[in-house]
Amino acid sequence: MKKTALALLALLVSSASLAATPWQKITHPVPGSAQSIGGFSNGCIVGADTLPVQSEHYQVMRTDQRRYFGHPDLVMFIQRLSTQVSNLGFGTVLIGDMGMPAGGRFNGGHASHQTGLDVDIFLQLPKTRWTQAQLLRPQAIDLVSRDGKHVVPSLWKPEISSLIKLAAEDNDVTRIFVNPAIKQQLCLDAGTDRDWLRKVRPWFQHRAHMHVRLRCPADSLECEDQPLPPPGDGCGAELQSWFEPPEPGTTKPEKKTPPPLPPSCQALLDEHVL
């Protein structure tokens, strides 16, 4: 009985944590000129574009989740990158989550992806296009060793390094988040051409995909950009600190209460949902 009660409690907690946010009730982009509003982890978007799900250069995964919306700059970046990759003969780019029709907070899985300027891209480039069944239930390839200290040599391919480099060299890209072990391998692969590495930032998880973030568009006056990454290639002490064990007594930070929405985002919710 106790086990059953605990199981039911866990299910209720899980269900509550995955309850739909108000943003998920907005099923179509909000009309208007494209405006990314607020910060990447606390914002929204007006006038989002829909990424076409049919393309000869890329494929969109989990279309049933309807997370293929973003600022026109993001849509153009995806089209630009995937065309470059295709022209080089690397394979098909696999597109994961972008944002919801009006951006905003997800019910789980992402803290950012709220202003239409973020996209997840799988770090695999299949030569054969995936079936619809594969796209709906994609199988990620974990490129990082079990101990988290390096990539798996048999899984790492030069095309993956080139994919990340191509994305980082795009003028609209401000950051790319990957696992520290992947960043470490990129540092080893880069040779003397290293300027692009500054944009590639180590982050938790991200073992099978890269998270690409664009800068705020010039005409999105309420968009909040992050500071630029520190100068340099980021391959030194900062990167190595990710592989050091936590200091004794270190505890996980408590989950923070989400900050208030930017006024324009709250007004958008008030008009379209609440």
Curated annotation (Swiss-Prot):
Disulfide bonds join C44-C265, C187-C235, C216-C223. Zn(2+) 1 binds at H110, H113, D120, H211. InterPro entries: Hedgehog_sig/DD-Pept_Zn-bd_sf, Peptidase_M74. Binds 2 Zn(2+) ions per subunit. Zn(2+) ion 1 is bound in the active site. Zn(2+) ion 2 is bound at the dimer interface by residues from both subunits. One of its GO terms (biological process) is proteolysis. It comes from the Bacteria. Keywords: Disulfide bond, Hydrolase, Metal-binding, Metalloprotease, Periplasm, Protease, Signal, Zinc. It is found in: Periplasm. Residues 1-19 form the signal peptide. NCBIfam families: PRK09429.1. Belongs to the peptidase M74 family. This is Penicillin-insensitive murein endopeptidase.
